[in-house]
Curated annotation (Swiss-Prot):
PANTHER family, per database record: B3 DOMAIN-CONTAINING (PTHR31920), B3 DOMAIN-CONTAINING PROTEIN REM20-LIKE ISOFORM X1 (PTHR31920:SF145)
Any one GO molecular function term: DNA binding
Entry superkingdom: Eukaryota
Pfam families assigned: B3
SMART domains the UniProt entry points to: B3 (SM01019)
Higher taxonomy: Eukaryota, Viridiplantae, Streptophyta, Embryophyta, Tracheophyta
Protein name as it appears in the record: B3 domain-containing protein At1g16640
Cross-referenced InterPro entries: B3_DNA-bd, DNA-bd_pseudobarrel_sf, Plant_B3_domain
Main subcellular localisation: nucleus
Alphabetical list of CDD domains matching this protein: BfiI_C_EcoRII_N_B3 (cd10015)
């Protein structure tokens, strides 16, 4: 019976080699399904997603088109490490580790939500307002 669990690898980010594309370790190729996927999704801890094209060059596999967006959006710089957890269904969950080797979590803009001060959607009667309208 085939193993269907997650598999993973880590890569250091080296801008000279990894800004435009990222080479996936050769030993990882056995985990890709046939037919070979044209694209994969990269997901971060917050659920943000990037669709990235995969390209084979001989035995080597690279993340190409779309990878630059991931690099830019995550402010990747030399010395950070990336952990890729593959679900074997075209999705990599990516954890970014900083220079201190601790995982990085970024704050993203929050949408302001207006909270209704009234219960059950009905306005409360205010004695002062009643006096003004009488």
């Amino acid at each position: 019976m085939a193993d269907t669990g997650e598999v993973q690898f880590m890569k250091p980010f080296i801008s000279e080699k990894s800004s435009k594309s990222l080479e996936i370790p050769l030993g990882f190729n056995e985990y890709f399904p046939a037919p070979f996927p044209i694209t994969v999704d990269l997901l971060d801890y917050s659920g943000r997603s990037w669709t990235v094209r995969m390209k084979k060059r001989g035995e080597k596999v690279f993340l190409t088109v779309g990878w630059e967006n991931f690099v830019k959006d995550n402010n990747l710089e030399d010395g950070k490490y990336l952990q890729f957890i593959y679900d074997r269904d075209r999705t990599f969950y990516v954890i970014i580790y900083g220079h201190n080797m601790c995982s990085e979590y970024r704050d993203f803009p929050q949408v302001a939500v207006e909270v209704d001060d009234y219960e059950n959607g009905e306005e409360e009667e205010d004695g002062d307002d009643q006096d003004k309208h009488q």
